[in-house]
Swiss-Prot record:
Record protein name field: Large ribosomal subunit protein uL18
This protein's GO CC annotations: cytosolic large ribosomal subunit
GO term, biological process aspect, one: translation
Subunit structure: Part of the 50S ribosomal subunit. Contacts the 5S and 23S rRNAs.
Presence of keyword Disulfide bond: no
InterPro entries: Rbsml_uL18_euk
Biological source species: Methanococcoides burtonii (strain DSM 6242 / NBRC 107633 / OCM 468 / ACE-M)
GO MF annotation, one: 5S rRNA binding
Amino acid sequence: MATGPRYKVAFRRRREGRTDYHQRLRLLLSREDRVVVRKSARHMQIQLVAPDANGDVTLSSAISKELAKYGYEGSTGNTTAAYLTGLLFGYKTLAEGYESGVLDIGIQASSAGSRVYAALKGVVDSGLDVPHNSSVFPSDERIRGEHVAEYMEGSNLPEVFDAVKEKILAEFS
């Protein structure tokens, strides 16, 4: 570890690899609400966050665990669950009176066709206004889980996807 008067210690969250302060500053200066998408190995979490001088305020949120309420029994960490979580989040957010946001993926790698962009597609399909480029979205076959049904015997993920999507649409229609 370097020492001396010229050595500057980075912020703790930067050292831990948890916050990109340059990106955060750009997002905060836009003064728009952020659609924050975070993924773990088992779940997807999406929040609408408003900047505030006293700290960010969460306005609306959805997590993939909530899909069980709509009859989804598959893995909550896959592309299908990410899309359905985004769709659920979008409808919940619109019902609460919010109409737009800017995507915030944090320090996650931006990879076309990833779960992050599957969640964004769900948010956009619900009607929430989020600036995006549709070329980064995964294909509809991957979102429905048809690639899983091909190699996994007894998998009915596309049918479950359609049923859960209909239940979400029915609740918010």
